[in-house]
Amino acid sequence: METFVASGLRLEDTELARFLTAHGYPCLDALHACAAAQPERFWREVEQALGLRWATPYQRVCDLARGPAWPRWFAGGELDLHDNLVGRIACEDPQRPALLWEGDDGSVRVHDYAALDDEVRRLATGLAGLGVRSGDRVAMYLPMVPEAAVVLLACARLGAIGLPLFSGYGADAVASRLQDSGAKLLVCADGYLRRGRQVDMLGEARRAAERAPALEAMVVVARLGGGRWPEHGAAHWRETAYRDLVERSAPRQGAAPHAADAPLMILYTSGTTGRPKGVVHTHAGFPLKAAQDMMMAFDVKPRDRIGWITDMGWMMGPWLVFGGLLRGATLMLFEGTPDHPRPDRLWQLAGRHRLTHLGLSPTLARLLMAEGEAGLPAPGALDALRVFGSTGEPWNEAPWRWLFERVGEGRRPIINYSGGTEIGGGILACFAGLPQKPCGFAGPIPGMVADVVDGAGQRLRTPAAGESDGGNGADAGVGELVLRAPWPGMAAGFWQDEARYVDAYWSRFPGLWVHGDWARIDADGHWFIEGRSDDTLKIAGKRVGPAEYESALVGHPLVKEAVAIGVPDPVKGETAVCFVTLAARGAAAATAEGWAASERALRAHVAERLGKPLAPARVHCTAALPRTRNGKILRRLVRAAYLGQALGDLTSLEDPAALDAIRACAEPAGAVA
């Protein structure tokens, strides 16, 4: 596979190169070796490079008395996160922009570091006045508005545990998380704008609050009301306007140190069954991991401007806040959708705010690519942009090349980034200034002692240079992605459920974190994620990732998007069934009469690329694919809907009607949605 090096960024000019030079490492491989062999030295150097200020120095970098599943990082140390993230820059460079916000309607707000410092201190005072104490859980049900960042930071200052929730959740999802966490207070918005329409949040929040007996207060951000929210008595909680609370509270000065391993935040991530998992992160670990990844992989420097299309209820929202502010950067928060009111809205946003870093999903790139010329930026719109970021799902080659070549003009690297909520950041990444392959990763982020193992937990052999990797065969290095050592950003367990955490990640192979992804390493040392290990198909004994099918289909001119699942087959054991949405030129093929010929053509197209034994049994045409609001296609739900199985947790689903289209495909006689 062809290797690319973005022309606009040299390795020697990056923060990674500066770190290597400052600490005497001749190359990145030497840094990886040190991180594996001397983790205490490595992580001490990282925290010092990030400039962490300790109120009480730590006694030990990592205490493993309870084993690798339960490390205590920076044991004995205390730090004031507010001082590290906001306070020191508010003193040294008060007018540096900290938060930029653009609403769906184009309205803009700016907080410099001094204003952010003042508002965080005021809100912390106000929350304390409402009874919030260290260790209490404070939930936030907010769109991407500046107040979302302020709430996270105010909780950190108080030692309260922040609980960011996805803004698209309904009352049931919010209630289950309030109940599980025992949240004392909820900060919510009255609503937000999406594609020019008002979306209610306060009604959903109140319905959820009725089922959360531990909740004592609700603070309401008037995003839509445009004025002050009147205090409102309710069944067992009281309501207060956010703006009133901030304005009547003093910006209390002084330090606010907390233990390095004190809980900072609970991030909920959905499981396929059972209740959502509350992933606990700590005061030192999560900000350090986020900022380290920004420094080493993304080349984020102080005063850079970072935007990421995400939600505060997903890991990348808090990652942006804690990592970006620790790097002294300016954060861009965007309320709207990146293709409204025009397909080039995202590029306009990046240009208007002079973003240096922009994060987006592969799905968004595919959608914009399908718009043709209308999905491209205007000349000069991205002049300030140095780096693209991407996470959340695997790439297909065609949209990757479109983003790199057509949008990025070959000058801007795409930092592919794979990790997860439980990781607190990334396991694998590309690195600014280093070669990259479409859809792949240059390797593990330093400190992540990653490996690929077989079903017995044994390391898989990587093909030698010049040796064929055999495509994607089981003996060519495709196996489970594991981690052989702990790291500061790792989950400090699941909220009040230690056994479930150990079972999820540490129970399969002794001493190894099993992440649940299939991965492979090619002969050049580049890494590739082949999908979730529970998504992988095994057809007549041949293991193949769904991304293989999806990449082949998206490469056909009829297809806009694709998803592949495995279904039971009496002969092969399992066979592939695919679902596609159509590009503009394929719309005429969507009729029942025209689709039969198009389906045959697409099956042949896949067979030509993957081999006849791996040809999909069916390729269905559907109007939409089930996805989250941040663009991730939900294969689990596609498979469950198609097979008529229980759907499980639907809280992250954007459009439930998409599941009806999938169910229709399963009807007799090959009905087409």
Model feature map: region roles:
Residues A30-C34, H82-D83, Q95, L99-L153, ...:
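Conserved AMP-binding/adenylate-forming core of the ANL superfamily
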Residues Q95-P97, V219-V220, G233-Y268, R275, ...:
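Conserved pre-ATP/AMP-binding loop-to-beta segment of ANL
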Residues L153, R157-D244, S361-P362:
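Structural core segment of the AMP-binding/adenylate-forming
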Residues A217-A222, E608-I633, Q645-V672:
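AMP-binding/adenylate-forming catalytic domain of the ANL superfamily
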Residues P287-R305, M315-H357, A370-G372, L376:
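Conserved AMP-binding/adenylation subdomain of ANL enzymes
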